[in-house]
Amino acid sequence: MEMVGKIACFVVLCMVVVAPHAEALSCGQVQSGLAPCLPYLQGRGPLGSCCGGVKGLLGAAKSLSDRKTACTCLKSAANAIKGIDMGKAAGLPGACGVNIPYKISPSTDCSKVQ
């Protein structure tokens, strides 16, 4: 019986050691998730399906590293994409009924994201 316990312990240990780690959030995921928001942020369309992307991003950014990545990607997009209404960008989480731990803005300090 003692041998069975050792084998079971070894099997569990192997499962923990080789368990797949969740993929880290990428800028590509952030951008594709929020692509439906672009017309709204540029004043060319309604909020529409944008909130699904915002909520999906919030759900995907579970770790501190993911939240900082999302912040950095959003900050870069806010700087790179022309015609974004920064007021709408900053108000996007509230308009979608979610709370994110930083402001969507080119001036956000993503190193302070918690």
Curated annotation (Swiss-Prot):
Family to which the UniProt record says this protein belongs: Belongs to the plant LTP family.
Keyword Signal (UniProt): yes
GO biological process: lipid transport
Keyword annotations of the record: Disulfide bond, Lipid-binding, Signal, Transport
Disulfide bonds: C27-C73, C37-C50, C51-C96, C71-C110
Pfam families: Tryp_alpha_amyl
The UniProt record lists the keyword Transport: yes
PANTHER family referenced in this protein's UniProt entry, alphabetically: NON-SPECIFIC LIPID-TRANSFER PROTEIN 2-RELATED
Protein name: Non-specific lipid-transfer protein 2
Single GO term (MF): lipid binding
Function: Plant non-specific lipid-transfer proteins transfer phospholipids as well as galactolipids across membranes. May play a role in wax or cutin deposition in the cell walls of expanding epidermal cells and certain secretory tissues.
Signal peptide stretch: 1-23
Organism: Nicotiana tabacum (Common tobacco)
